């Protein structure tokens, strides 16, 4: 089925929207905004979850399980059906009925594009760091009194939500490239954190993946700006190409990266950063104004994300000092180096449990490097990781890189591959990663046995990370219990 791409709010009636998979991170966010705008929202999800409770509380009618009759509300059908074409099969009974009834079926990105209309659009794109950078931008702009609307792929720890319909002119959102959805938007400010081949099951070649970011840059409004990270080679090259095309482009990055790419005017330069007791202290020059910010979440990649967030806020009129105050107050996003607890007493005294969404070698490297920095600053402990590969295609494509990245830990437990939307591949297991690792590693295909395996490896003051985009997140509290009670 061909999915319509809509050009204006007049093309579709959003008065009564049905969302299939409403409990997902992206879908639940747009549902919140629709409800805040007074729309009637129904939806369905395969299983009940804590995500559905607040949506029901503000007026959504949600069914658990998929059935044709879920489309009806008091005998009336929706004006539009929204779905994720990657996650929802085409024989879903609600999709089938929508087609039979002639109801328009659109993607989440089409809906988000409609919701963005009329706002000053700040879109955060890139292979890695979208959710963190978007979240930092939100918190910074909120502190600057801008009350932006936002839709992000994770839940802000402090706000406890992934979306908000604000009173300000700015709307901040992630621009997902995985299926070229980012080409639905017309940003006023487009941030590209990095560009590295991914989602090759969709794009087929790295060249096609790179091209989608060039196309995205071409959709920026005439008076808008492209913002690129100069520390990332492909993002910097995108910036250089865009400058030559006449697209207004600025860069951010460390001083050496800024010097290496003089063709892209730098508007945010990281002058210095160092680990301190509170986190990471960074000195950043924003368009000639030098500011100091303390980031609670560790890692050089988070300093870069913070610089991007400050620059995005500055470009849409935010006061730099207030933006910095907000950024210093940023406590993270669910599943991004998320703290679950520490052990007090016993043989695991001082061990701390964290959970992270990292599922690409570059992300794994960044998170483990940040953990190592924290251990080094403390002068004690090790880094232990429980990693669950996500998708067979990604595991096969990056098996060598995963082995190298995971070897930054001191020891690891690697779970079986989480296939998600993919079917198992004969002869392929997580052992293609573990066989190439250079640290002590346990391949553990039994999900429920992982906490025990971690207890056999961990020690006092260790940082223990559960990592991956699948079900591994459920193990963080179980590992905490295992170590606390062992």
UniProtKB/Swiss-Prot annotation:
Its EC number is 6.3.2.8. It is found in: Cytoplasm. It comes from the Bacteria. Gene3D superfamilies: Mur ligase, C-terminal domain, Mur-like, catalytic domain, NAD(P)-binding Rossmann-like Domain. Transmembrane segments: none annotated. One of its GO terms (molecular function) is UDP-N-acetylmuramate-L-alanine ligase activity. It is an enzyme of class 6 (ligase). Keywords: ATP-binding, Cell cycle, Cell division, Cell shape, Cell wall biogenesis/degradation, Cytoplasm, Ligase, Nucleotide-binding, Peptidoglycan synthesis. GO terms for cellular component: cytoplasm. The keyword Methyltransferase does not apply. Its main location: cytoplasm. ATP binds at residues 126-132. It catalyses: UDP-N-acetyl-alpha-D-muramate + L-alanine + ATP = UDP-N-acetyl-alpha-D-muramoyl-L-alanine + ADP + phosphate + H(+). InterPro entries: Mur-like_cat_sf (IPR036565), Mur_ligase_C (IPR004101), Mur_ligase_C_dom_sf (IPR036615), Mur_ligase_cen (IPR013221), Mur_ligase_N (IPR000713), MurCDEF_pg_biosynth (IPR050061), UDP-N-AcMur_Ala_ligase_MurC (IPR005758). GO terms for biological process: cell division; cell wall organization; peptidoglycan biosynthetic process; regulation of cell shape. Pfam families: Mur_ligase, Mur_ligase_C, Mur_ligase_M. Pathway: Cell wall biogenesis; peptidoglycan biosynthesis. Belongs to the MurCDEF family. PANTHER family: UDP-N-ACETYLMURAMATE--L-ALANINE LIGASE, UDP-N-ACETYLMURAMATE--L-ALANINE LIGASE-RELATED. Cell wall formation. This is UDP-N-acetylmuramate--L-alanine ligase. The gene is murC.
